[in-house]
Amino acid sequence: MNKLLVILILALGFCSNTAAQIDPLLLKASATDSVKRSLNMDAVYNRPFTAIGKLPVSLGGYAEANWQHIGTNGVSDGHQFQFRRMTLFVASTISKRIKFLSEIEFEPAEKEIAIEFAAVDIEFHPLLNLRSGMIMNPIGAFNQNHDGPKWEFTDRPISATQLLPATWSNAGFGLYGKTYKNQWMFGYEAYLSSGFDNSIIENTENKTFLPAAKKNAERFEELQSGEPLFTGKIAVRHNKIGEIGFSYMGGVYNKWKQDGITIDDKRRLNVFAIDFNTTLPVLKTFLTTEWAWVQVNVPETYTEQFGSKQHGGFIDLVQPVLQRNIFDWKNATLNAALRLEYVDWNIGTFKSTGTNIGDNLWSIMPAISFRPTPLTVLRLNYRYLQQKDILNNPPAKTGGFSFGISTYF
């Protein structure tokens, strides 16, 4: 079925001899300009689409590929070449106030084609829209605003993919809306969806690990706990200050009842996140950051390696250092960037010794990126990372370079 869907999409791209035209509103060269007109919640639509003749759909997408040479404690696998992903967007305006958008991702390493987003939006009022289908839960900012060409780094933030389960999609529905006045903009989202299961504490990582739930494809048809996952977010933006968002995701994750008989206590997980982005005056430095706190009700019979409290986040700084016409590229930009990251999967102390539990890491990643156009980025990164095991033994030290390209098409 997935293969047929991809073939259909590719066929649409070639079946028209009419010249395609990209919506100029989506080709703003300045990231700052696009941010002023939108919130992170608009990321699913704030992409370049190509209209093909009189076909009722618009297409788009992006691809990512990179080289890396990374080693841990002096041991390296040498040069590695990776085609990370190719993603296709399909959008359609069904009628006035009704539209559809989907995001289909192919990851060769995972040997799978996955639908990450496929939802129908019905607008009743700018502050009241109904969304139904396969949604991206708005926890933090990265989960919704994750397109590779928007970032100066070859790797996604560790806290977004190894603490939170980005990209995290579920079957569900809910409401969203936004409004603005003068320099201010306000937006909200509230969804009920399927969600997590026992795999977050029963996995090969042998720790509390939310991303393990992504492997359960049954969540798109069946909710193990029988109780919906709630995800909500509010965001406020001022054009001269930036955007701040507060989000929450929580619900019962375990199977606590079977055939009407209670077989376990209800066990909840709660995730709180805050995100912020702004462009600093004078130097035009772009800053974006996200931090999340995770609380999981772990059974008392589990060992202490399964943490009930976790937290982590990242901060990105991007400084334009050169902007000029190069070859046929107008306003090509050279950036210097830096990412700082921290994740702790097990906050607390051992009951027997009172010493701190480990299982954490920190990372620093300087980068240089070149954007010939706003839609394409070439990026050279160096990562240095230290990770401690649960016993706080001397950390494993990882370092190395990566170079990659990511572009919309």
Q: Which residues does each predicted region cover?
A:
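Bacterial Sec-dependent N-terminal signal peptides
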Residues: M1-I22
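N-terminal periplasmic/intermembrane-space "pro-region" immediately following the signal or transit peptide
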Residues: T18-E64, F409
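Outer-membrane beta-barrel pore domains
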Residues: I22-L26, S30-D33, G74-V75, A118-E123, ...
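Outer membrane beta-barrel
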Residues: N46-I70, V75-N198, G226-T231, A235-E243, ...
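A generic structural micro-feature
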Residues: G53, Q80, E112, P165, ...
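Extracellular/periplasm-exposed beta-strand and loop segments of Gram-negative cell-envelope proteins
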Residues: N145, S159-P165, I201-E205, A217-L223, ...
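A short, charged helix-loop
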Residues: Y188, L192-F196, N206-K215
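Loop-centered beta-sheet repeat module
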Residues: T208-K257
